[in-house]
């Protein structure tokens, strides 16, 4: 009996040694996205033949130039919630890995999202409230807490947000948008977490995946909504996958470092040169943020499944998507459509930081401006940066001048006809990338009013 137990433990240890990552870690039955592409990562794992139990159908197996990856697509349509087993065999050697299809929450597909009736409270996650000082520095990540460093980690976390939800609600907020919470293992400046190193894992300095579930539950208990800040354009250079790329073109590569020219207008400018468009879309946002290649089907599928996984897992109510207009526009359109096909009422707002209404309208779903180039982003909402531009100066200007003062606000509204859905715009006076509104007006309370 002891010998059998020992062999069982040894077999399990071998299995874990062979598979270092399995993503998504589980899925759900009764999903619109029923052909699930599971990525297995481990030393020379592609040398194995892959089979699966329970009559589950393998639709496709993709191996890349990197033998440490294999992508296995299974058909889960009409498959009830259950556990099944993948078997990996190489000659006489074999090991197994359990996979789970879970039952969905009731009415998950038609979940209610945020809309123009909501007041959203934006939180810089590391800088809001420290609810658990014990997780300020974690052995698994490089940068430790240092409140003396303005660019360092200061200790804000998920527990701190939960502890202050009653306060946030008392301000009139009906939704919370924390800046990204997934792991960012950059050695410095990681507090913003826009350079993520593991997109299936909450940064341990913020808490755990389970604590993020609790945040959603506590928000919903109060009738409030949880908006996840998602990044499709780039990861951080410490992402575990960047250190061992599945394919050379998983990220955009250049002979040397090439930074984005930030000219988002090249995405639709009929006069733009091909090199300018390429530099905008394929160039890296900054040197520490490898630019993801959404025109690679494996990358696009990985990002799509990851986004849907977080919605279903954490019971989310919406997305804000960072640097939306820097992505490959056809790829990001497919990504957005896949999510809204899965969740028809799910709102997604894109950061389209442009200063012209026609250019911004191009990126909203069913835009007549986009239709000129036969493009539909499928993006329900965009952030109203032109209104933000006007709000930042109008109260400092002479109202008697023809094009100054409140006339700027009026002129902004006269262009509302360009948007296919003006009632689904995210209106704001400031955010984490801008000066505070009081800074713009030198703490003049009358102007603030």
Question: Predicted segments — roles?
Answer:
Residues 137-140, 186-202, 232-276, 358-374:
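Aromatic- and acidic-residue-enriched segments that line the glycan-binding/catalytic groove
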Residues 216, 220, 234, 306-308, ...:
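Active-site-proximal helices and loops of the catalytic beta/alpha 8
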């Amino acid at each position: 009996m002891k010998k059998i137990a020992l062999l069982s433990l040894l077999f399990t240890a071998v299995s874990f040694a062979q598979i270092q990552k399995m993503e998504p870690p589980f899925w759900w039955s009764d999903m619109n996205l029923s052909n699930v592409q599971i990525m297995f990562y481990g030393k020379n794992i592609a040398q194995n033949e892959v089979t699966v139990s329970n009559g589950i159908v393998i639709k496709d197996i993709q191996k890349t130039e990197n033998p440490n990856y294999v992508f296995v697509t299974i058909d889960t349509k009409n498959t009830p919630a259950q556990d099944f087993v993948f078997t990996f065999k190489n000659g006489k050697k074999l090991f197994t890995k359990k996979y789970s299809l879970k039952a969905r929450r009731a009415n998950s597909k038609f979940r209610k999202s945020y809309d123009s009736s909501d007041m959203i409270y934006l939180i810089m996650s590391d800088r809001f409230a420290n609810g658990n000082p014990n997780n300020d520095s974690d052995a698994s990540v490089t940068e430790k807490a240092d409140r003396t460093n303005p660019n360092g980690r200061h200790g804000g976390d998920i527990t701190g947000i939960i502890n202050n939800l009653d306060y946030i609600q008392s301000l009139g907020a009906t939704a919370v948008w924390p800046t990204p919470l997934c792991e960012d293992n950059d050695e410095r400046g990681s507090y913003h977490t826009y350079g993520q190193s593991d997109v299936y894992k909450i940064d341990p300095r913020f808490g755990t995946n389970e604590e993020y579930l609790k945040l959603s539950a506590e928000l919903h208990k109060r009738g409030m909504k949880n908006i996840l800040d998602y990044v499709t354009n780039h990861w951080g250079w410490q992402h575990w996958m960047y250190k061992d790329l599945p394919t050379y073109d998983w990220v955009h590569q250049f002979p040397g470092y090439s930074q984005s020219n930030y000219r988002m207008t090249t995405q639709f400018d009929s006069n733009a040169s091909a090199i300018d468009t390429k530099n905008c879309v394929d160039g890296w946002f900054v040197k520490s943020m490898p630019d993801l290649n959404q025109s690679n089907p494996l990358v696009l599928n990985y990002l799509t499944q990851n986004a849907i996984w977080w919605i279903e897992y954490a019971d989310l109510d919406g997305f804000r998507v960072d640097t939306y207009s820097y992505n490959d526009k056809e790829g990001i359109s497919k990504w957005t459509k896949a999510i809204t096909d899965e969740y028809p009422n799910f709102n997604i707002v894109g950061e389209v930081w442009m200063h012209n209404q026609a250019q911004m309208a191009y990126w909203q779903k069913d835009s007549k401006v986009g239709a000129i180039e036969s493009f539909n982003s499928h993006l329900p909402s965009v952030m109203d940066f032109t209104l933000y531009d006007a709000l930042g100066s109008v109260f400092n200007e002479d109202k008697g001048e023809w094009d100054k003062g409140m006339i700027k606000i009026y002129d902004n509204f006269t262009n509302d006809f360009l948007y296919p859905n003006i009632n689904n715009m995210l209106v704001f006076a400031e955010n984490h990338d801008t000066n505070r509104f009081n800074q713009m007006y030198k703490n003049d309370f009358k102007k603030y009013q």
